[in-house]
Amino acid sequence: MSVTRDDVRKVARLSRIAVPEERLDELAGELNGILGWIDQLNEVDVEGVEPMTSVVETKLPMRDDVVTDGNIQDQVLANAPRSEHGFFVVPKAVE
């Protein structure tokens, strides 16, 4: 699979990122390089290797799952440009 200028343009549009036309070829090359590295993982022989989540066996202590409201709603909403009735108000993203 090869990433083209059109692919970069489409991903940029979907991500709502402004990418100048003169950077499309450069970014396509970078993405193709990244995908090439990822494709190399398909060449690794993992036959007989047990799946793992980490190479280090670490036991993490569990805490009680207690629901709280945080008691800082006013502080959190103070950072928001807009809020109503204790909730964030954000611009509509999907039409």
Swiss-Prot record:
Example of a GO MF term: glutaminyl-tRNA synthase (glutamine-hydrolyzing) activity
GO biological processes: glutaminyl-tRNAGln biosynthesis via transamidation; regulation of translational fidelity; translation
Enzyme class: ligase
Catalytic activity: L-glutamyl-tRNA(Gln) + L-glutamine + ATP + H2O = L-glutaminyl-tRNA(Gln) + L-glutamate + ADP + phosphate + H(+); L-aspartyl-tRNA(Asn) + L-glutamine + ATP + H2O = L-asparaginyl-tRNA(Asn) + L-glutamate + ADP + phosphate + 2 H(+)
UniProt keyword Flavoprotein present: no
Name of one Pfam family that matches: GatC
Enzyme Commission number(s) of this protein: 6.3.5.-
Entry keyword set: ATP-binding, Ligase, Nucleotide-binding, Protein biosynthesis
Membrane-spanning parts: none
Keyword Nucleotide-binding: yes
Quaternary context: Heterotrimer of A, B and C subunits.
Function: Allows the formation of correctly charged Asn-tRNA(Asn) or Gln-tRNA(Gln) through the transamidation of misacylated Asp-tRNA(Asn) or Glu-tRNA(Gln) in organisms which lack either or both of asparaginyl-tRNA or glutaminyl-tRNA synthetases. The reaction takes place in the presence of glutamine and ATP through an activated phospho-Asp-tRNA(Asn) or phospho-Glu-tRNA(Gln).
Family, as annotated: Belongs to the GatC family.
Record-given protein name: Aspartyl/glutamyl-tRNA(Asn/Gln) amidotransferase subunit C
Organism whose genome encodes this protein: Hyphomonas neptunium (strain ATCC 15444)
Top-level taxonomy: Bacteria, Pseudomonadati, Pseudomonadota, Alphaproteobacteria, Hyphomonadales
Gene: gatC
